[in-house]
Amino acid sequence: MLKSLDVGFNFAAVKPESGPRRRWCIFTSAGDQNAIHLWLQGNTQHQWDLVVAYYGDDSKEFSELAKVSSYAFRTKGGKFQILKKLVTEKPKFFDQYSHVWVCDDDIKMSAAQIDEAFAIAEFYEFWVAQPAFSPRSKISHLINEYAGSHCDYRLVNFVEENTPIFFREKLIQFLDVYDGSLTGHGNDWWYLNFFKANELGHLRNFRKTNELGRFAIIDRIQVINPHDVEKGQREIDRLQPLAERYARWVEVMIKNGLVVFPQMIFASCKISSHRIPGVPVTRFDVARRIASSPIRKLVRKYKKLSADWRKKRKATAVAGRIAQ
């Protein structure tokens, strides 16, 4: 018996519910230039379900995607817009999963890479994580580029919206406040503001080192984010032109009091052989990052000058009283 997935969009036929229950899920909104076939290559049985929202107009392409998906349906919109509608209509849809990877459909990666990225994100209990981008990739934010073999993952305050792996409970929390107004640009800043990533690394949070383990870029996994020239016209531009996406983001940012903030790396970490759970970040890591900031240096210098001035003023007052 086939289960139907009706979320208020077009009807979708999907695979039977038989088979192992998986704890991980990839969700993507796919067009006709997707790279999903790469995700499924190899003889090993992957450990995740694939949920595809197809926004193209080719019935044959949709049929092929439905064959390889756990769930597939047809609709228009961006990933997070569709997710919002899906979870609104089916609140328990993702309940069986520990992590949900909200991934662009054109990311080039293998099934083995996907399995390992999920395993690392789950093991270290990251709220949101992403794989690093190969140097061959389109790099929109320098922090996302592969850092080198000296680290397996970096603890950061920024995870881009094209490949975020969410701890499922955190994704649902964000979707509760997300109104579906953004097609693409700005979704990452929205969920990072919601999770208070913009407050990490501040001097006032010096003692809260445990909070620095919430977001990560996994350098052990390098994927390819293809350049625009490889894809031709970006399919998201057909949904909404870039200028309109940016203008809408500015409106949302003002309405919700969101901020764009400097991207920071708090620690570069290796995965130890004994694999002790938890994130090895110390206050020294925080202090080093804070001290390296030019603004922090100026503040520290100002405080030192102020303290010296107060000491001199006090000494002058004491000398005056003695002279009297």
List the predicted regions and their residue ranges.
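Short, hinge-like loop/turn segments at secondary-structure boundaries
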Residues: V68-S69, E145-S149, Q233-I236
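C-terminal catalytic/acceptor-binding lobe
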Residues: M1-A12, S181-Q324
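Short, high-confidence coil segments that cap the C-terminus of an alpha-helix
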Residues: Y97, Y124-F126, G213
